[in-house]
Amino acid sequence: MSKAMNADNPEPATKSVAAIAPSLKAEILAEALPYIRKFHGKTIVVKYGGNAMTEEKLKHGFARDVILLKLVGMNPVVVHGGGPQIDEALKKVGKVGTFIQGMRVTDEETMEVVEWVLGGEVQQDIVMLINQYGGQAVGLTGKDGGLIRAKRLQMPDRENPGTFIDIGYVGDIEAINPAVVKALQDDAFIPVISPIGFSDDGQAYNINADVVAGKMAEILKAEKLVMMTNIPGVMDKKGNLLTDLSAREIEELFADGTISGGMLPKISSALDAAKSGVHSVHIIDGRIEHSLLLEILTEQAFGTMIRSH
């Protein structure tokens, strides 16, 4: 059964770790030890998006957090979004982003923008920061090593069952070849994946980053999938945080419209990952500094846990 947490104040508790008392820091480090043992050698897929990608302090904190996970023996794989950056780039060419059921309508010009923003600007920024702090990150798109093979998405028209909506060059994942990711992991690198897929004839497709993260977690047999967002987690219609959701409860939230817009692909992908065998799937508030470490290395209840049963 879902547990609701009151969210009268939707702003995150952005207390910096630097402000925590030394004794509490020691407790946190001691608390992390069993989790470090538990997840040693395990793959952790992180969907990186929202404010954590645009606020400088959070960006630098995320880079350090990912490096720490690698240093203590885990295998983090980062799948990044970049919606705000794409919107900003589209404005410069006189276009406005349009979304249907949480998916960006992608014409030919928009696809070109998506490719150079995600596969270039955003990816390079993440890789640079991780490497700047002493990590070894390598950026990938779906073309590298045949990582993500995609076809044009057929989006069902909910108002006209049996028909489909054309949303352009939006991709549906046909297959993921994890060989290049596993090779990088074996050589102590941190893969940073842009959600761009390619068809056999070389056509690029814009794929929702949540969808890529969920499928990547499934194919890599990840221990955990953590999705970072701009909200505390899944909220009910009264603004309360739902800390634990089963498959049945998620279907009810879809049906009554509680989950809508950009949350649709996010929750669908999270649930699919849980059903596929990913042991732990969480949606967390990326606006909280070091939220990734708090989720993985402490007992602190955080965000929304997605269960397959």
From Swiss-Prot:
UniProt-listed Enzyme Commission number(s): 2.7.2.8
Domain of life: Bacteria
Protein name, per record: Acetylglutamate kinase
Source organism (scientific name): Cupriavidus metallidurans (strain ATCC 43123 / DSM 2839 / NBRC 102507 / CH34)
Site (Transition state stabilizer): K47, K266
CC per GO annotation: cytoplasm
Pfam family, one: AA_kinase
Function: Catalyzes the ATP-dependent phosphorylation of N-acetyl-L-glutamate.
EC top class, as a word: transferase
Compartments in which it is found: Cytoplasm
